[in-house]
Amino acid sequence: MDKKGAILEHIILLRGVTPNGQNAIPKMSYLVDILTEAGFQYVRTYIQSGNIILESDLAIEEIREQVHTLIKEKIGADLKLVIKNKSDFTKIVQENPFGEHYLYDRIHIILFQNAIQSLPLEKLNIDYGEEEICIGNHCLYLYLPRTAKRKKLNTNYLEKLFGVDLTMRKLNVVEKLLTK
């Protein structure tokens, strides 16, 4: 865990953002405003699905509590979130196990707030057909080809399998977040 004091750049991934309804975030610019007013620094977002980059000297758990509370109180959305240091995202991109023969836009990343190795990963030892899963140091890597008849490897399935909150992003979104 991070110690309070050093200002670090963090990436926050919101889980369950919807275009309308209970978990909608009407404008990402409003989210930037409320997080900035709360004292977070250099706050920015990427696409409407709930990707936030900010700087803070707070520990990750404190950031998580504050961001969750602010979104719930100011916007009304009760969203799960995963927060990682930007350096973790750099490692995730560098450690991508899928080579050039894989379609880049079909590679997905599953993130968990704690260490991925703390999950009961032995539960993944089943046949997923054309879909592939690789265990990384910081995440799970999924390859979900368009030709797969029924996509089993998705966030809902994995959350039920492990009994924890997870979130998924495409690898190209993770890479884009590093440039923001």
What is each stretch, according to the model?
Residues 7-49, 53-180:
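Surface-exposed, charge/polar-rich loops and edge strands
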Residues 1-7:
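N-terminal amphipathic/basic-hydrophobic helices that include classical n-h-c signal peptides
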